[in-house]
UniProtKB/Swiss-Prot annotation:
This is Aspartyl/glutamyl-tRNA(Asn/Gln) amidotransferase subunit B. It is an enzyme of class 6 (ligase). One of its GO terms (molecular function) is ATP binding. It catalyses: L-glutamyl-tRNA(Gln) + L-glutamine + ATP + H2O = L-glutaminyl-tRNA(Gln) + L-glutamate + ADP + phosphate + H(+); L-aspartyl-tRNA(Asn) + L-glutamine + ATP + H2O = L-asparaginyl-tRNA(Asn) + L-glutamate + ADP + phosphate + 2 H(+). It comes from Lactococcus lactis subsp. cremoris (strain SK11). Belongs to the GatB/GatE family. GatB subfamily.
Length: 477
């Protein structure tokens, strides 16, 4: 029997606010254990949560980016469960009135297949702390993460392959990233994903029994976990067995999912309205204010790059892969620089440097101003492309002006024939055999002489001018 795969994803996104959702403690990643905490995070008796308005702002922006309806009157709920990293013994979340509902997002697979994935809801909640089990037999609780604001985005079970799930995550990350409400970095925990997977015979409308898969810390691991889980369930069903509703953990070393616990239902959490957080009324004016603050989406930017700037689809996708690079590009072309040249540098030398240094664009000295200044120096013949690579490294490491560095370092390209001719004659004198070979009909000998000329000028000779002069002198020598 053949089965159809049914996948739904629950994605937690950490919001980039300066303080937590209900306390003034910092949300900064890292730091010593329990250093970014407040009495509210510790749940000391008598303390009350105070809502961070910036979290509501971020929730509205996310809902708009995901084409969702917005609950204009909403409240928070208590989700009750006991665990050491949850000192209140309940989590403040949203149950029946999430901030966003009834949304959708477009996905595209590598083969060009497109689909619309519906999004059931997006609700705001606080994160829990973190447990660490030491080798000394003790367990330790770090509450730095306790109270960090999250938005949980729950898709409908519209995905039919692990590849579609991967494409959905890619599109979702891009949409959230361009709102500016989160950096969506899975490696730092600011984006986490749980998957619900079930199988059903083709043609059957009812869903099969689902399992939830956790502990997937990258998009590729999500795909690997889904591949394994689909195969595991299919094997059980074909053998006449039954699937249990359970929660499983992905082991990235073995590529397998492992049983964690029998799945709880929503009733186990005993949701009820949070009495200490008031109901919020979201006006149309508030929503429009957030809509107007949203930057151009990645999709709109790609269309602009292709239709208005003449870039290829590949270039447009590379530039919009991260908002930081796209923003940098948009600023750079304001200086009347050829968009294609800026694109080439960002995808070439800049990307290679960032990868090798394991840094992001804002962490180096390169700016839209000094990059475009350097490109102009290449275009007007002041420096060669080879010298430009040296200039770029200087700008990346230390910032500053490209033009000032070129002058200070003596890197200005030699284009004056009166300066080049004596050097050419000196090269001929030191390489008489190559000159004789060229005059004897060996054309490649001239290339060797050009190489010697560039070496003699430490790469500063204008290649076009130097090569033209050298051939003229060879023919007249």
């Amino acid at each position: 029997m053949n089965f159809e795969t049914v996948i739904g994803l629950e994605v937690h996104v950490e919001l980039s606010t300066n303080s937590k959702i209900f306390s003034p403690a910092s949300t900064k990643f890292g730091g010593d254990p329990n250093s970014n905490t407040n009495v509210i995070d510790w749940s000391l008796p008598g303390v009350l949560p105070v809502m961070n308005k910036g979290v509501i702002d971020s929730g509205i922006k996310a809902a708009l980016a995901l084409n969702m309806d917005i609950h204009k009157s909403m409240h928070f709920d208590r989700k009750n469960y006991f665990y050491p990293d949850n000192p209140k013994a309940y989590q403040i979340s949203q149950f029946d009135e999430p901030i966003g509902y009834n949304g959708s997002i477009e996905i595209e697979l590598e083969d060009g297949h497109k689909a619309t994935i519906r999004i059931e809801r997006a609700h705001l909640e606080e994160d829990a702390g973190k447990n660490t089990h030491g080798t000394d037999g003790y367990s330790y609780v770090d509450l730095n993460r306790q109270g960090v604001p999250l938005i949980e985005i729950v898709s409908e079970a519209d995905m039919r392959t692990p590849e579609e799930a991967y494409a959905y995550l890619t599109a979702l990350k891009e949409a959230i990233l361009y709102t500016g409400i989160s950096d969506v970095k899975m490696e730092e925990g600011s984006m986490r994903c749980d998957a619900n997977v079930s199988l059903r015979p083709y043609g059957q409308e009812a869903f099969g029994v689902k399992t939830e898969v956790k502990n997937m810390n990258s998009f590729s691991n999500v795909k690997k976990a889904l591949d394994f889980e689909v195969a595991r369930q299919a094997k059980i069903l074909r053998a006449g067995g039954e699937i249990r509703q359970e929660t499983r953990r992905f082991n990235d070393k073995t590529g397998e999912t492992i049983l964690m616990r029998v799945k709880e239902g929503a009733s186990d959490y005993r949701y009820f309205p949070e009495p200490d957080v008031p109901r919020f009324e979201i006006s149309d004016e508030w929503i429009e204010q957030m809509r107007e603050s949203l930057p151009m989406t990645a999709t709109a930017r790609r269309a602009h790059y292709i239709n208005d700037l003449g870039l290829s689809d590949y270039d447009a996708r590379q530039l919009t892969a991260t908002k930081e690079v796209s923003d940098f590009f948009d600023q750079a072309i304001k200086f009347d620089t050829d968009p294609k040249l800026v694109s080439n540098w960002l995808q070439g030398e800049v990307a290679q440097y960032l990868n090798s240094e394991k840094k992001e664009l804002h962490e180096i000295g390169l700016t839209p101003e000094n990059l475009t200044e350097m490109i102009r120096l290449i275009s007007d013949g002041t420096i060669s492309s080879k010298i430009a690579k040296k200039v770029f490294i200087e700008l990346a490491k230390n910032g500053g002006s490209a033009e000032e560095f070129v002058k200070k370092a003596g890197l200005v390209q030699i284009s004056d024939p009166d300066l080049l001719l004596p050097i050419i004659h000196e090269v001929f004198a030191k390489n008489e055999q190559s000159v004789a070979d060229y005059r004897g009909g060996k054309q490649n000998a001239a290339k060797a002489l050009v190489g010697q000329l560039m070496k003699a000028t430490k790469g500063q000779a204008n290649p076009t001018v130097a090569q033209k002069l050298l051939y003229q002198e060879l023919d007249n020598f």
